[in-house]
Amino acid sequence: MSCLRIQAWWVWLAVGLLAGLAIGGLVPDTPLHAFATDRVDNIALATGPVDWQEGIEAMYFLDFDTGSLKAAVVSNATKGFQAYYAVNIRADLMAAAQRAGVQLPSQPRYMMVTGLVDIRRGGASQKLPARGAIYVAEANTGIVLVYVIPWSPQAHASNQPVVDSLVLWASDRF
């Protein structure tokens, strides 16, 4: 009797494993994307996608004191960075605050995260909006600025150095 229970247990385990494998084979794979953000004192650092289909990401660096937002993309051919992007967010933040009718504090408090975006990309242009965005929020006012990298897949593929500005894609108060 005890021997039959042990054998039945193995049979059910085998049936369950086979059923799980069969169902798992029918369900399409779901890609997972992980990005990182960290801060210390008045500096924030984040990683985010540029062209996630190609596995390319950028490093973003925000200096809270100066409002300087910089991004860099690692070269795929040599050691070092291949592309650099920068913008000072203060002018964009001031313009968004004026539109929202709010006063900016003397000491802005920033938060920064990255994410995937689905922006229409025309094929004719050399520079396309990246597939990722950097979101910078000012915590006192609720204003969020969204920046994208003007991405050139051709420049990256040929390891051509790039120095350009980040593009303000959207801004609003929440």
Where are these regions (language model features)?
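Short, solvent-exposed interaction modules
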Residues: L93-I143, I149
